[in-house]
Structures are given as C-alpha cells and as structure tokens.
Regions:
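Conserved "HGTGT" condensation-loop signature of ketosynthase/thiolase-family condensing enzymes
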Residues: 1-81, 85-104
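Glycine-/small-residue-rich "gating" segment that lines the acyl/pantetheine channel
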Residues: 2, 6, 114-118, 142
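A short, terminal or domain-edge coil/loop segment
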Residues: 27, 36-40, 128-139
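Residues within alpha-helical segments
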Residues: 60-67, 117, 121, 146
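Acidic, glycine-rich active-site loops and adjacent beta-strand->loop/helix elements
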Residues: 83-88, 110-111, 136-139
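Active-site-proximal alpha-helical scaffold in enzymes
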Residues: 107-134
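Single conserved hydrophobic/aromatic residue that forms the stacking wall/gate
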Residues: 140-148
C-alpha cells in the first residue's frame, strides 16, 4: 500500500511508463512543439465525416502506436483510462470499444492525462491492474472551427 509524505504518495513498487505516443493535427504541426509529435496529420478530420469520429480515429492511432512502442498488444492492457472534451467521453468510449479494452472514462478536461496517470499509478501499485493504457484527446477543430 502507498504511504504519504505530505501531499505525495510513495509507492512500494513504483509504476513505470513503458512507452508514450503523441499524434497531432494541423495546428499542432504549426506549433513550436511540432517536432515533439510522433506523427502529424494535415487533415484535422482524418478523412472522417465528423470531428467526433476524427477524435476516435486519433485515439485509436495513438493507442496502437503506444502499444507498438511498448512491444505490447491490447491483451497486455488490464484497463484503459481515457477522456476527451466531448460529452460522455464519446471518442474515448468508441476507441475503447474498437480496442476491445475495459474502459474507465475520466472527466478532467485539461487535467485528464494527469488524472489518468495518477489513477493508473494507484491501480498498478495496489495490484489491481498489470498494464494500463492512459490517453486523452482534443483535436483543435470542430464544425465551427474547420476553416481556422
């Protein structure tokens, strides 16, 4: 069980981040951080009919790239911790279904990734999960912003 030192949790068996992946869209490609992305798409819709479907595809591509970089498969994942800025975690739910993974939706807005890493660390340290996939998604686009 973790112990506390002030506001910090100390895990007897510290969790490990086995891999990470980051895929962005057009705006990310124009940013000063563009070189930090694994892949960039020039089409924010990723060929999809809606931006919800595009975010689902972005999450799927990123999850699969992360698993590949970790030399893992979906079978190595006990739980997917994910969220997005859509009502009811729409893109995350569809991505989880396509990956065939148990899913816990997180609603932290901009803090979703930090929330997923913190909750995931606690679950792994407590022996409740062996392999976790943590992800979040926000494409800088919507029907109103497609021409930006």
């Amino acid at each position: 069980m973790a112990t506390r030192r002030g506001d910090t949790l100390i895990f007897p068996k510290p969790p490990v981040i086995a891999a990470h992946a980051c895929i962005g869209g057009k705006k990310e490609g124009e940013s000063p951080l563009a070189a930090e992305f694994d892949e960039l798409h020039s089409d924010n819709r990723l060929g999809q009919a809606s931006w919800e479907a595009a975010e689902t595809q972005l999450q799927l591509q990123t999850a699969r790239l992360c698993l590949k970089k970790a030399h893992a498969t979906e079978k190595d994942v006990s739980l997917l911790l994910a969220g997005d800025l859509q009502a009811q975690c729409t893109a995350s739910g569809y991505a989880a279904r396509a990956l065939g993974l148990p899913f816990a939706g997180l609603f932290g807005a901009c803090s979703t990734m930090a929330e997923a890493l913190g909750v995931g660390a606690c679950l792994c340290s407590a022996g409740m999960a062996d392999g976790l996939l943590a992800m979040t998604c926000l494409l800088y686009t919507s029907d109103a912003a497609d021409d930006m």
